[in-house]
Amino acid sequence: MHRSTFIRTSGTSSRTLTARYRSQYTGLLVARVLFSTSTTRAQGGNPRSPLQIFRDTFKKEWEKSQELQENIKTLQDASGKLGESEAYKKAREAYLKAQRGSTIVGKTLKKTGETMEHIATKAWESELGKNTRKAAAATAKKLDESFEPVRQTKIYKEVSEVIDDGESSRYGGFITKEQRRLKRERDLASGKRHRAVKSNEDAGTAVVATNIESKESFGKKVEDFKEKTVVGRSIQSLKNKLWDESENPLIVVMRKITNKVGGFFAETESSRVYSQFKLMDPTFSNESFTRHLREYIVPEILEAYVKGDVKVLKKWFSEAPFNVYAAQQKIFKEQDVYADGRILDIRGVEIVSAKLLAPQDIPVLVVGCRAQEINLYRKKKTGEIAAGDEANILMSSYAMVFTRDPEQIDDDETEGWKILEFVRGGSRQFT
């Protein structure tokens, strides 16, 4: 296969080289013709027409090109013979055999794979396989129980705290509700995470006697000069006429450039959103909130969502998404079934964008994530599975729109965060 590819490449290269020689030769002829014409005119000899000069020069150069013609012919003959050579034929035969062989091997591997899958399934369902799994599960349980005293030692806890530096949640994982609460309390106690602080709106309103005289800002002075003086109004009118309203192409281009440069330094929508959250809570930062989303808020909400925990979701959801979810749960309740899903893994928790919602410019953060989950619904009376499968793992995408209520920042659970929109996107079977 490689050899035939080389042969085809060699033929293509020879044709390319031939075209290159011809192109270089033609350029050389034209250059010499022009040079001869300019030389004749400069010397002031017998005037000859440009056509005569071109004909004579071309004839002389063509006579000198026998070597070039022979090289071109040699290359063409070599490329033609190469295609008919024994090496070329052998390489092509080897290539075709390799193709046929790969097809046969592919079919054989597929058949072998199906056979192995059948054998593995039978082994898994056999009595020996079932007994082995039970023994392994019992052994794992005993090991877990025997290791529990080690987990309670001071050294183990200190090592665990050092290893968990707050970045492990970035790469996925999921811990239980109790573990989340304990970790949150531990982080607050150790100072890794600060409690939300409600801004004091009354701060700074007390009257303080000082000797400092109030000074008018420079910008205010400029505005007063433009609006209240004759000279200022004249300058402003001249600026509008010569700059703002001018249709001169040069002025239009310069105006666009200054607008672009000014836009670089303008405050973006995202910075305005973060500034508003910073005013509500001086301890707020993008990095700390993203970590809090990964470690506590998103796992808390998604677990409640797949388990049908209406009480937890009512704390986090605003009225609109909560009413939608409550209506769904009401239908399940009427059918005497309840949700008993599980979250296995959460990853990709990121703040996608920051927006100001019109018309009141409400600051919001759009958060996205992916979760591996099992959706189950059980009968209330017997606990039997009514819908779903414990072995069916789904990969689902979620999107949430967060805002913050300044009046509830001191809430120990939510710290004022509310979900305005909650969307469960597409789900596919995880394999």
Swiss-Prot record:
Gene Ontology CC terms: extrinsic component of mitochondrial inner membrane; mitochondrial inner membrane; mitochondrion; PAM complex, Tim23 associated import motor; TIM23 mitochondrial import inner membrane translocase complex
Keyword field: ATP-binding, Membrane, Mitochondrion, Mitochondrion inner membrane, Nucleotide-binding, Protein transport, Transit peptide, Translocation, Transport
SUPFAM superfamilies (UniProt xref): NTF2-like (SSF54427)
InterPro entries attached to this UniProt entry: NTF2-like_dom_sf (IPR032710), Tim44 (IPR017303), Tim44-like (IPR039544), Tim44-like_dom (IPR007379)
Binding-site residues, ATP: 101-108
GO molecular function, a single term: protein-folding chaperone binding
Short name of any one Pfam family annotated for the protein: Tim44
Localisation: Mitochondrion inner membrane
SS bond list: none
KW Membrane (keyword) present: yes
GO process terms (BP): intracellular protein transport; protein import into mitochondrial matrix
Membrane topology: Peripheral membrane protein
Chain segments carrying region Interaction with SSC1: 43-209
Consequence recorded when altering residue 180 to A/K: Disrupts association with the translocase complex
Main location: mitochondrion
Subunit field text: Component of the PAM complex, at least composed of SSC1 (mtHsp70), MGE1, TIM44, PAM16/TIM16, PAM17 and PAM18/TIM14. Forms part of the receptor complex that consists of at least 3 different proteins (TIM17, TIM23, TIM44).
Family classification: Belongs to the Tim44 family.
Function description: Essential component of the PAM complex, a complex required for the translocation of transit peptide-containing proteins from the inner membrane into the mitochondrial matrix in an ATP-dependent manner. Recruits mitochondrial HSP70 and its co-chaperone (MGE1) to drive protein translocation into the matrix using ATP as an energy source.
The protein's name in its UniProt record: Mitochondrial import inner membrane translocase subunit TIM44
